[in-house]
Amino acid sequence: MAQPKILLTRIDDRFIYGQDVELWNEAVGSNLVLIVNDEIAADSRKWAPMRVSAPEGVWTRFFSVQRTVDIIHTATPRQLILIMVASPADALALVKGGVPITKISIGHMRAGEDRRPVTPAVAVDDADVAALRELQKLGIELEIRYLPNSNPDPIQLVI
């Protein structure tokens, strides 16, 4: 069985937001945006706004972490996949579940209680840092990059 064509995995807790997904889709050439989040997958009322925001001609799917692990290897060769997750923990669960992720771009992680800002768009807590460190130990390439044409911030800001 061929490996699924995962072009990029992106951590962005807004998922499909404004022009961001359009720019990222253009940059990597995906034709399927896979939103992987247990909460969103369980609530189809949240899907419509994201589907409307997706670029024309790009499919969107909403799966839980476990469903993604279970079916990612059934992707066809013509599916060029951009995976969107909300957190490093979800990305780590995918990798540990056998999803062949090689690179993760961190774009937006909301500030909040017990979260410290590391860039204007990324705030982390201790669990995020631990998950990112583990991903790095597993050989996953990590970068902080807001938009495809922006310069990446060093991952050392986080880990």
Regions flagged by a language model, labelled:
Residues 21-22, 91, 132:
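Generic hydrophobic/aromatic pocket-lining and core-packing "Φ" positions
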Residues 10, 49-61, 70-84, 117-124:
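Short basic, glycine-rich beta-strand/loop surfaces that mediate nucleic-acid
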Residues 1-5, 112-115:
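Gly-rich Lys/Arg/Thr-decorated short loops/hinges at beta-loop-alpha junctions or inter-strand turns
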Residues 5-9, 31-34, 59-61, 79-83, ...:
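Structural motif
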Residues 97, 102-159:
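Glycine-rich, aromatic-bearing surface loops/beta-hairpins
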